[in-house]
Regions:
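Membrane-proximal alpha-helical anchors
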Residues: 2-77, 83
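An amphipathic alpha-helical interaction surface
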Residues: 81-162
Length: 162
């Protein structure tokens, strides 16, 4: 009888300790998940900053700089210059599409995405070449992203030179 008493007492103590331990474990897991989400978002922002910097620095290539100056001066581009600008613009659009995916997955908050959308729209202001690139390549992009870009272009259509 004394043995059964001790077994029952230990069983009750284990039951008492188990409840709070489970609650603490769940709380700890939730805290870890929240931390990992913050780390993931920070890594995503860092990745976006690096990608943006890469594309921006690539735009400083002498061929692209020469081509951009010609566009500003309304001079005709060589084949190499036009191809370079087309490839560069496509890379920019792919990077922005990636930002769109990250926003959809919750890795970018709404404020960041709104800012990126505005910047996306400015790529087309007074730039017939970029508009042409978009028209010819938009079928290769996510349909939701296409709608967003088209909306941004439409909002700025009054800024395009005829």
């Amino acid at each position: 009888m004394e043995f059964e008493y001790w077994i029952e007492l230990v069983n009750k103590i284990v039951n008492i300790v188990t409840g709070p331990a489970v609650i603490f474990s769940v709380w700890f897991l939730v805290a870890q998940i929240r931390t990992q989400i913050k780390v993931g978002k920070a890594a995503s922002r860092q990745s976006i900053a690096e990608a943006h910097q890469e594309v921006t620095l690539a735009g400083l290539d002498p061929l692209l700089m020469r081509a951009k100056l010609k566009l500003i001066k309304k001079e005709e581009l060589s084949i190499d210059e036009e191809v370079g600008l087309r490839i560069h613009m496509t890379a920019i659009l792919r990077a922005r599409e990636n930002h769109f995916y990250q926003h959809k997955m919750g890795m970018l908050d709404d404020e960041e995405w709104k800012t990126m959308r505005k910047a996306l729209g400015t790529l087309f202001i007074d730039n017939q070449l970029n508009l042409d690139i978009w028209k010819k390549s938009k079928s290769t992009f996510n349909p939701e992203f296409v709608s967003i870009v088209d909306e941004e272009i439409d909002m700025r259509k009054d800024t395009f030179r005829k």
